[in-house]
């Protein structure tokens, strides 16, 4: 049963509202719009705004009270852009280039069944690094994800980067199926909470699938300002919401 008083539901996107990198189903979309009649809803994802639109619809800022791409470094409230932060002014060009060069050099040494293109994607608030390359097909994505579960390719890459860039104020966070994010310390999904913590909510619920240590939902999931729920799929998210808000 939900706690009394004004509340907000914040949802991760991949694995929580949609299958990884897939569009939201009509059933889930309809369910969330019904839920919105009872409670404010928002989304927070690591992906950029265009990818959030691809998955949740071009009208995403009209369908959710809050939309936080890139962990909230880009923020929309009530359909309007609130703010946009950028990584280069915070970290400086020298560190960004060192990081990009090191990642490309590391990727060049990994042998995988397949490699495609877009190994590093530069976003407003982070770098997204993918050993297989973001332009892989859905089948290639699943193949890499299964291999990564056995061989911990991303985990080893991140461990190496943490050692190489220790003391540089960087966080490395694994999310989704094929990549991990690199951003300044404190720019994880908790960043979005600064946009909502003064809006009068008694409870902020968070739903995410990568809630384990090292996962990109972990920090916001364990933050004392949220009530965190770990989910395994969109169906699981819906089930928990129905229990809480029926």
UniProtKB/Swiss-Prot annotation:
One of its GO terms (molecular function) is metal ion binding. Changing residue 139 to K: In CDG1A; this mutation seems to disrupt a splicing enhancer sequence and thus results in most cases in a protein with exon 5 skipped; slightly reduced activity. The modification N6-acetyllysine is found at residue 149. Its EC number is 5.4.2.8. Changing residue 192 to G: In CDG1A; normal activity but lower affinity for alpha-D-mannose 1-phosphate. InterPro entries: HAD-like_sf (IPR036412), HAD-SF_hydro_IIB (IPR006379), HAD_sf (IPR023214), PMM (IPR005002), PMM_cap (IPR043169). Keywords: Acetylation, Congenital disorder of glycosylation, Cytoplasm, Disease variant, Isomerase, Magnesium, Metal-binding. It catalyses: alpha-D-mannose 1-phosphate = D-mannose 6-phosphate. The modification N-acetylalanine is found at residue 2. Its main location: cytoplasm. SUPFAM superfamilies: HAD-like. The keyword rRNA processing does not apply. The active site is at 12 (nucleophile), 14 (proton donor/acceptor). GO terms for biological process: GDP-D-mannose biosynthetic process from fructose-6-phosphate; GDP-mannose biosynthetic process; GDP-mannose biosynthetic process from mannose; mannose metabolic process; protein glycosylation; protein N-linked glycosylation. The keyword Isomerase applies. Mg(2+) 2 binds at residues 221, 223, 226. GO terms for cellular component: cilium; cytosol; microtubule cytoskeleton; neuronal cell body; nucleoplasm. Homodimer. Involved in the synthesis of the GDP-mannose and dolichol-phosphate-mannose required for a number of critical mannosyl transfer reactions. It is linked to Congenital disorder of glycosylation 1A: A form of congenital disorder of glycosylation, a multisystem disorder caused by a defect in glycoprotein biosynthesis and characterized by under-glycosylated serum glycoproteins. Congenital disorders of glycosylation result in a wide variety of clinical features, such as defects in the nervous system development, psychomotor retardation, dysmorphic features, hypotonia, coagulation disorders, and immunodeficiency. Belongs to the eukaryotic PMM family. NCBIfam families: HAD-SF-IIB. This is Phosphomannomutase 2. The lineage of its organism: Eukaryota, Metazoa, Chordata, Craniata, Vertebrata.
